[in-house]
Amino acid sequence: MRELRERPLGAGLRVAIVAARYNEMLVGHMIEGAREALLEAGVKDDDILLVRVPGAFEIPAVARRLADTGQLHAVVALAVVLRGETYHFQVVADACAEGLQQVALQGKVGIGFGVLTVDTVEQGLARAGLKQNKGEEAARTALEMARLLTAI
């Protein structure tokens, strides 16, 4: 009997994880979650590139540059933006989201948006690994979008 099997979602794909160094404890959990999800999906470890940037604000510029190389299929963006006492939180969160949306609209790579905007460290912990891991979710989304963009 012949069996048709779908190849793993990540097989043959090259993926970058662009992660902020700010809020390292939380982002570190997300990086591990993203990496594990990519490996489980069939992405080879050698096909995963980790790029660290200072903070969330810097992610879109690096994601755009990576997309423009034509060497990657997907970019997973990871950061935690923690609300403070000033408007800075909103500026950084909005700039990061808008910048990544612009990269996504280019249609060159699948984008996984794993940028958490939280009010407290506890909320960050819950979303970065204790109860769920948004890094894993962002990685799976990036792979799905990469496959979809390739198929169109």
Regions found by a protein language model. Give the residues of each.
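C-terminal binding/interaction regions
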Residues: 2-4, 89, 94-152
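Amphipathic alpha-helical hairpins
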Residues: 35, 39-40, 47-71, 87, ...
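Glycine-rich phosphate/diphosphate-binding loop of Rossmann-like nucleotide-binding domains
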Residues: 3-54
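Structural motif
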Residues: 16, 49, 73-77, 109-115
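Generic secondary-structure signature for well-ordered alpha-helical cores
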Residues: 24, 36-44, 64-71, 101-105, ...
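Glycine-rich phosphate-binding loop
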Residues: 58, 62-100
